[in-house]
Amino acid sequence: SKGFGFISPKDGSKDVFVHFSAIQSDSFKTLNEGQEVSFTIENGAK
């Protein structure tokens, strides 16, 4: 409900920030805690 969160990579590396606008989905752009996802890291403006 915040519109953002963090993904914890399986390899134990640093958590990755994710914003809902970056989620590619045919339905609601939401992620659930514990859900496995595929992702590509991109640098964005901060």
Swiss-Prot record:
Pfam families: CSD
Organism: Klebsiella pneumoniae
InterPro entries: Cold_shock_CspA, CSD, CSD_CS, CSP_DNA-bd, NA-bd_OB-fold
Subunit architecture: Homodimer.
Superkingdom of the source species: Bacteria
SUPFAM superfamilies referenced in this protein's UniProt entry, alphabetically: Nucleic acid-binding proteins (SSF50249)
GO molecular function, one term: DNA binding
Subcellular location, record wording: Cytoplasm
Keyword terms: Activator, Cytoplasm, DNA-binding, Stress response, Transcription, Transcription regulation
Gene transcribed to yield this protein: cspA
Record's protein name: Major cold shock protein
GO cellular component: cytosol
Induction pattern: In response to low temperature.
Residue span(s) of domain CSD: 1-46
